[in-house]
Regions:
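A positional/architectural concept
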Residues: 1-62
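Charge/polar-rich, low-complexity and marginally structured segments
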Residues: 57-165
Length: 165
């Protein structure tokens, strides 16, 4: 576990960070409530404030932006046709939810790969479509910033990789 001082040294006010399901957030500062210390984030997606308890921020999926190498690796995952796509939608749903919970860009790319390929065979059920859209959005958002590309340009890259499957 990181101590409060380690975490506060790790994230600077104004820094962009990724917080699992919220995606891209801006670090706004520290707050203390009821004796617990929190990192205050601003969600760029829905313009809301998010408090992350410092004691388990990492387990909750708070992380720094990925490196260019990590983004490139995630983009490579998009064209990996050897990744399994389960027939049983409940198994697929649980696996993809677990992958999304890890919050890593690799995991997000695996979800995009799996559900994109599945959608080419059969329309996705509503819950899976929502996970797919969320994963795609997270991938695009982080890749755009790290690689310095706009959304339209990044979508072209992502879908050309997916189409190569």
């Amino acid at each position: 576990y990181m101590t409060y001082t380690e975490l506060s040294k790790n994230f600077d006010v104004g820094e962009l960070a990724i917080y699992r399901t919220y995606g891209l957030c801006t670090v706004e500062g520290m707050e203390e409530m009821n004796g617990l210390e929190y990192l205050r984030l601003h969600s760029n997606e829905d313009d809301s404030a998010v408090l992350v308890p410092l004691t388990n921020a990492e387990e909750l999926g708070l992380r720094h932006l990925s490196s260019k190498d990590t983004v490139e690796k995630a983009l490579t995952i998009l064209s990996d046709s050897s990744l399994p796509v389960r027939e049983d939608w409940k198994q697929r749903l649980n696996e993809n939810k677990s992958l999304m919970k890890t919050g890593t860009l690799d995991s997000v790319a695996k979800v995009v790969n799996c559900l994109y390929r599945r959608s080419k065979v059969k329309a996705l059920p509503a819950m899976e479509k929502k996970i797919y859209e969320s994963a795609l959005s997270l991938l695009l958002e982080e890749a755009c910033i790290v690689l310095g590309k706009d959304n339209r340009e990044m979508r072209k890259i992502v879908f050309s990789r997916l189409e190569n499957v």
